[in-house]
Swiss-Prot record:
Organism field: Drosophila virilis
Signal peptide: none
Record-given protein name: Ribosome-releasing factor 2, mitochondrial
Keyword terms, alphabetized: GTP-binding, Mitochondrion, Nucleotide-binding, Protein biosynthesis, Transit peptide
Domain of life: Eukaryota
Gene Ontology cellular-component annotations: mitochondrion
Listed GO MF terms: GTP binding; GTPase activity
Any single GO BP term: mitochondrial translation
Lineage: Eukaryota, Metazoa, Ecdysozoa, Arthropoda, Hexapoda
Annotated compartments: Mitochondrion
Main location: mitochondrion
């Protein structure tokens, strides 16, 4: 039990210290690469990571996902299912550089793991399945990397397979991701039929030896004149593409008046600059399972991805050295002590005495610090940083007033955006004696995985879990048993509906109460309107503007917090109320009235408005991609039609398969994976992810309400 709690704490306490000169040793930081590896499920992320560890000398044997002996997939559930659930950190050396790598999940249910990991990296490798190209989750993780402004390179995996099409992957990168791929390699078939690789920059052919698990490979000059001519044309295209985005290379091309006179070193330097500036994406290829091309991917990480010094910063850089036993202060105002510092290798930890800025480490002893918090050594340091940042913002805005109680959290925390839950279910301990242990375990799991929602339903007295999907819930239940020895019972899954108001409404609420001899008094006028952009606004009409301008920022903040908080639970099925704007018209707060009383009054006023306006249900819609043999498509489409699905497109997928693009209500997809296997006799595969919410017709809404109330 103690080990499980420690392990969970270690996994959720990863952090990255960053700094620029003159505060750190720049030479040390220049030798570091902090990278993440992202992909759609089953594209080969973990296999690629295992090969990197093996060739770097970190492991003595090749880990295989299907054998359940990989380093980075160490949870029991990961090895049983052959999928990555938790991000894993590993560190290894390659050609004089220290690479800190985070292997992330590919399944949509664990997208929060990806989001948290991206705060701790400076660049990413995106792995594509050479037989499938850009897939649904590829688009999702690419967008996440865009949001974090992360430079990236692409590794096209599984190129040894006969149905792999490199050109299609390049076309997908352009069409589906709006990327500018630079092909530094091209596929080559050797005489024996095995995959080889052409290096476009050096005009060489690379061949991997299979008798030593791909540890060595040969580099051969091209002999065929046709091969040389074709590859030189590709090299010229590469230089032409790069010179269009890199002025230094363009000047060299103009001065030499020849692509052939541009050296390999200049190309690599230009490609590095363009990659770090996110103007282009280098593309490499290989086969992780067949041990082909991985060393060159590691070379590309060193050559093209940025150091911590070159990483785009959100605010001014902060730095220093973290030492064992050091006392730190988080931006939440919590004083903490770093008890131990570790260098990670998945679930194995090597204790170190300190860690310098720019590196990645695992930290034990931080009880309240979470991903995204700023750590300083004193209140003075925090205040100085706060003042410098406020000066660079609009200091006149109430949101950034220095006296606000949450200014540290709002300005200095870079907490990831937590996706909305799509499923809910009740959770019960096996006995009352294990209730406290279950609650503590859920707190640990929630700290590690913020997409897990844990709420207490005051009406039913039950603890309610919210998650990203059926698999997410299954994994939570399994981990509670395997790591915390608590065999919980989960209730039936409930759909996470949302609600929207039927008609606009306005009301005034007056609340007066005597609490412990202190008179509390609030008079507030609020209005609810349909609005998809602005959640809270002030009425600037002449009759109200003077009243609202006289409000202290602190009062406005607690009013806003209370009003918005009331939208979290609608009157129909307790769903979040969306597409709704709260407009504050007028408010009067009596002298000495507590903030909590003002907040409660605002929430009560919004609840009154929701009852007055009425709400309608919005149901979650899933975007699905189904790959099935041609002869099975008609049966699959017929079944989807019965599930209220919208067939968006059916297109060829190779010679024998079709790709079906579908939008379907989540409520109709319970157990669909099993149904699809039955309809297709196990020959079809499917992926799905949330794509928004849609209004329901009256009959479906009535049925949903009855189900939510346990009447059906």
């Amino acid at each position: 039990m103690q080990y499980s709690l420690l392990s969970a704490q270690l996994r959720c306490s990863r952090f990255l210290l960053r700094q620029q000169a003159p505060f750190i040793n720049r030479c040390y930081s220049d030798d570091i690469r902090n990278i993440g590896i992202l992909a759609h499920i089953d594209a080969g992320k973990t296999t690629t990571t295992e090969r990197m560890l093996y060739y770097a000398g970190k492991t003595r044997s090749l880990g295989e996902v299907h054998r359940g002996n990989t380093v980075t997939d160490y949870l029991t559930q990961e090895r049983e299912r052959g999928i990555t659930i938790c991000s894993s950190a590993v560190t290894f050396a390659w050609n004089g550089k220290r690479i800190n790598l985070l292997d992330t999940p590919g399944h949509i249910d664990f997208t929060m793991e990806v989001e948290q990991s991206l705060y701790a990296v400076d660049g990413v490798i995106v792995v594509l399945d050479g037989t499938a190209g850009v897939e649904a989750q590829t688009v999702t993780v690419w967008t996440q990397a865009d949001n974090h402004r992360l430079p990236r390179l692409v590794f096209v995996n599984k190129m040894d397979r006969s149905d792999a099409i490199f050109d299609k992957c390049i076309d997908d990168l352009k069409a589906k991701l709006d990327a500018k791929p630079i092909c530094t390699q091209l596929p080559a078939k050797n005489v024996d039929g095995q995959l080889g690789i052409y290096d476009v920059i050096t005009l060489e052919q690379l061949t991997w030896q299979q008798n030593d698990f791909g540890r060595t490979y040969s580099i051969n000059k091209l002999e065929s004149s046709s091969e040389i001519r074709e590859l030189r044309e590709k090299r010229n295209e590469l230089i032409d593409q790069l010179s269009g985005v890199d002025d230094e290379l363009a000047e060299v091309v103009i001065s030499t008046e020849s692509f052939d006179k541009v050296s390999n070193e200049l190309i690599v330097q230009a490609l590095r600059r363009a990659t770090c500036q996110q103007k282009v994406v280098p593309v490499l290829l290989g086969s992780a399972y067949k041990n082909i091309g991985i060393q060159r991917v590691m070379d590309a990480v060193n050559a093209y991805l940025p150091t911590p010094n070159e990483r785009n910063q959100i605010y001014n850089c902060f730095g220093g050295e973290l030492k064992r036993g050091m006392r730190v202060l988080s931006s939440r105002g919590q004083a903490e002590v770093i008890s131990k510092i570790y260098e990670p290798l998945a679930d194995e930890y090597r204790e170190v005495s300190s860690v310098r800025a720019g590196d990645v480490a695992i930290c034990a002893g931080l009880k309240s610090t979470v991903t995204g918090d700023l750590l300083t050594t004193s209140h003075t340091s925090l205040k100085n940083a706060q003042k410098r940042l406020i000066q660079s913002l609009d200091a006149t805005s109430p949101q950034y007033d220095e006296d606000e109680v949450d200014v540290n959290q709002e300005l200095f925390s870079i907490e990831p955006k937590i996706p909305d839950a799509v499923y809910f279910c009740s959770i019960e301990p096996p006995s009352l004696s294990t209730q406290t242990a279950m609650e503590q375990a859920l707190k640990q799991l929630q700290r590690e995985d913020p997409s897990l929602r844990v709420n207490y339903d005051t009406v039913t007295g039950q603890t309610v879990l919210g998650g990203m999907g059926e698999l997410h819930m299954e994994i939570i239940k399994s981990r509670l048993l395997s790591e915390y020895k608590i065999d919980v019972d989960l209730g039936p899954l409930q759909i996470a509906y949302k609600e929207a108001i039927e008609t606009p409404a306005i009301t005034t609420l007056s609340v007066e109460k005597d609490i412990a001899g202190s008179k509390q008094n609030v008079n507030i006028t609020l209005q609810l309107t349909n609005n998809q952009t602005e959640l809270f606004s002030l009425d600037k009409s002449p009759e109200n503007v003077q009243n609202l301008n006289a409000l202290r920022p602190r009062v406005l903040q607690v009013l806003r917090k209370g009003a918005i908080g009331a939208l979290e639970r609608g009157p129909r099925v307790g769903g979040q109320v969306v597409d709704t704007q709260i407009r504050l018209h007028n408010v009067t707060v009596g002298r000495g009235t507590a903030d909590s009383f003002v907040m409660a009054a605002a929430a009560q006023c919004v609840q009154k408005l929701l009852s007055k306006s009425g709400t309608r249900l919005l149901e979650p819609i899933m975007a699905m991609q189904i790959v099935a043999p041609n002869e099975r498509v008609s049966g699959i489409i017929a079944d989807l039609s019965r599930r209220r699905a919208l067939i968006k497109d059916v297109m060829p997928k190779g010679d024998r398969n079709k790709l079906i693009l579908v939008n379907a209500p989540l409520a109709e997809l319970s157990g669909y994976s099993s149904a699809l296997r039955t309809i297709s006799s196990g020959t079809a595969s499917m992926t799905m992810q949330p794509c928004g919410f849609s209004e329901m017709n009256a009959a479906d809404e009535t049925l949903a309400v009855r189900r939510a109330q346990g009447l059906d």
